[in-house]
Amino acid sequence: MFVRSMKIAGAVLALAATTAAAQKVVATKMGGGGSPHETVEYSVGGAKITISYGRPFLKARKVLSEVAPAGKIWRTGADEATTLTTDKGLMFGSLMIPAGTYTLYTVPGPTSWKLVVSKQTGQWGTAYSEDKDLGRADLKVETLPKPAEQVTISFTEAGGSPTLNIDWGTTRATSPFMVH
């Protein structure tokens, strides 16, 4: 029984190490509006995915009513617009994202969020034009066991399937995706 438990623990640690090795923070700096900024790289299925975003602090504010109001477009971070760069096509639900650089927005809600992928890049985070949308995909909402004081965008992998995570406050918005 002990040997079996050790094998299971070893497998879990190996999976965690593989996921951690595939994702790394490559840059941290202060943004133009005062929030720290982070650039995360993630490699999966032969694709290199990079997300650069501002990481505002919650500071006792409420996510869905004060900072990222439910049903309204949100810059998904702070300061400059959040960018996604991929060297391979990605599929979030039925939304196909070709290789390239895009701006990410979200539409938060209490039970589900929308991921909004815009073809417009290089703008300040609040400059949004719906006619520049590549498309939208559903994000599932989960409750975090411990609140995230800062916006955190990360990737996880389970059974070879990658997932995008956006954490803030007690909310985690997630979407599995595929590389094409």
At which residue positions do the language-model features occur?
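Absolute protein N-terminus
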Residues: 1, 22-23
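Bacterial N-terminal signal peptides that target proteins for export
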Residues: 1-10
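Short, surface-exposed loop and linker segments with low hydrophobicity and enrichment for Pro/Ser/Thr
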Residues: 6, 98-100, 105-108, 152-160
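Structured alpha-helical
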Residues: 13
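N-terminal signal peptide c-region/cleavage motif recognized by signal peptidases
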Residues: 17-19
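Primarily secretory-pathway and cell-envelope proteins
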Residues: 23-72, 121-180
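Mid-length scaffold segments of soluble, non-membrane domains
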Residues: 73-123
